[in-house]
């Protein structure tokens, strides 16, 4: 076999370490230095399995079993399992509690992974309404309407799914209202917390949710791929059913999920998560400051206002205007930010972009604001 492996010898991430990364999908997954030191010992394949006696969630060394119990407390749920991401968590719920052909009633801002999960589980869906431009908020009452409509036409509803914070606008949905509707109608309720758990405080019990899908690499300062599924005890038997052949192994987990660095990194970052969610108000202050400072430049923030989450989506007609006359065309903004050590804004975009300053220091936030101001004021 003639395979040239030279190209794998110097794989680098091609990202200057000092760069300030504004990509919302990446800000919540940055590991604190302490976690980086801990995972150094765990880079071998099945590194957490040295003392396994049959199942990942029961491993005592390293203390995965205790970590999962503590994580349940952190999320206000009863039982937690590691997964490879929020999408795998959603799929595990759908595949276990719904029957083929059932309907999932989900919000109009649901992520594509909710759709691929339900398609893979051979389910149908009904999408609820959202507000129009520019807020695009989920309308909780629409859940009741869609449920009534499906019931009237004798369709079987298997699950109610809500995206806690959507990735397009960063709107925080009214979970309590949707939870009340799901409960009063008697349907199980799954909350997709990919963009919330680990960034902001979550209490599943208070929110009336039956399942939480969380994402380690997106919002829990963990190496990807990694996630969590937290469930209400009531659903333990269905969701965590074990194999008839190997009675210890859970079917939806295909026996065991995260078997190395990802789960270990999540454990190593747990203390950091506990501390950082306490500072959510400060994150919102920084986010709102960015919006207030940048809108006068000719940006328009889309989604609910003021911001209740760190994702910021701006419409940017001013960048479009500059791109018309700049010889770098649409790439000027990316290039100018890069010169200033700022990355994470998509290359070539001028009509709108998304950003987040989650976890940056106040000095870094001011630097980002001033950099954008100076780019636009110099080139307009
Ligand atoms: C709202 C939302 N849910 C789920 C996901 C997927 O998360 P994961 O990669 O953990 O499956 C994303 C990723 O962008 C997301 O924005």
Curated annotation (Swiss-Prot):
InterPro entries: PyrdxlP-dep_Trfase, PyrdxlP-dep_Trfase_major, PyrdxlP-dep_Trfase_small, Sep_Cys-tRNA_synth_arc, SepSecS/SepCysS. The lineage of its organism: Archaea, Methanobacteriati, Methanobacteriota, Methanomada group, Methanococci. It comes from the Archaea. The modification N6-(pyridoxal phosphate)lysine is found at residue 218. Pyridoxal 5'-phosphate binds at residues 86-87, 192, 215-217. One of its GO terms (biological process) is translation. Its EC number is 2.5.1.73. Its cofactor is pyridoxal 5'-phosphate. Belongs to the SepCysS family. It catalyses: O-phospho-L-seryl-tRNA(Cys) + hydrogen sulfide + H(+) = L-cysteinyl-tRNA(Cys) + phosphate. Converts O-phospho-L-seryl-tRNA(Cys) (Sep-tRNA(Cys)) to L-cysteinyl-tRNA(Cys) (Cys-tRNA(Cys)). Homodimer. Interacts with SepRS. It comes from Methanococcus maripaludis (strain DSM 14266 / JCM 13030 / NBRC 101832 / S2 / LL). The keyword Transferase applies. GO terms for molecular function: Sep-tRNA:Cys-tRNA synthase activity. This is O-phospho-L-seryl-tRNA:Cys-tRNA synthase.
């Amino acid at each position: 076999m003639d395979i040239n492996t030279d190209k794998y010898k110097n794989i680098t991430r091609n990202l200057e370490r000092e760069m300030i990364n504004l990509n919302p999908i990446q800000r919540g997954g940055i590991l604190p230095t302490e976690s980086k030191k801990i995972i150094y010992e765990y880079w071998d394949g099945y590194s957490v399995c040295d003392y396994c006696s049959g199942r990942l969630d029961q491993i005592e060394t390293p203390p995965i079993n205790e970590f999962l119990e503590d994580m349940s407390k952190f999320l206000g749920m009863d039982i937690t399992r590691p997964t490879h991401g929020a999408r795998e968590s959603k799929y595990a719920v759908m595949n276990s509690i719904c029957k083929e052909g059932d309907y999932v009633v989900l919000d109009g801002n649901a992520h594509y992974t909710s759709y691929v999960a339900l398609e893979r589980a051979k389910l149908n869906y009904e999408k609820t309404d959202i507000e129009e431009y520019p807020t695009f908020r989920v309308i909780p009452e629409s859940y009741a309407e869609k449920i009534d409509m499906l019931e009237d036409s004798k369709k079987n509803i298997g699950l109610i799914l809500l995206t806690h914070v959507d990735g397009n606008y960063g709107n925080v949905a009214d979970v309590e209202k949707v939870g009340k509707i799901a409960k009063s109608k008697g349907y199980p309720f799954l909350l997709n917390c990919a963009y919330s758990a680990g960034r902001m405080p979550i209490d599943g019990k208070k929110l009336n949710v039956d399942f939480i899908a969380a994402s380690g690499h997106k919002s829990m300062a963990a190496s990807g791929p990694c996630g969590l599924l937290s469930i209400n005890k009531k659903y333990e038997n269905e969701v965590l059913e074990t194999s008839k052949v190997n009675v210890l192994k859970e079917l939806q987990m295909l026996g065991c999920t995260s078997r190395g660095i990802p789960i270990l990194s999540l454990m190593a970052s747990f203390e950091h998560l506990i501390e950082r969610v306490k500072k959510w108000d400060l994150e919102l202050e920084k986010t709102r400051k960015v919006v207030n400072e940048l809108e006068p430049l000719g940006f328009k923030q889309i989604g609910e206002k003021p911001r209740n989450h760190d994702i910021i989506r701006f419409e940017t007609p001013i960048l479009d205007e500059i791109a018309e006359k700049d010889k770098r065309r649409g790439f000027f903004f990316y290039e100018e930010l890069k010169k200033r050590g700022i990355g994470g804004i998509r290359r070539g975009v001028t009509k709108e972009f998304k950003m987040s300053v989650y976890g940056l220091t106040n000095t870094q936030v001011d630097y980002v604001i001033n950099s954008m101001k100076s780019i636009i004021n110099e080139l307009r």
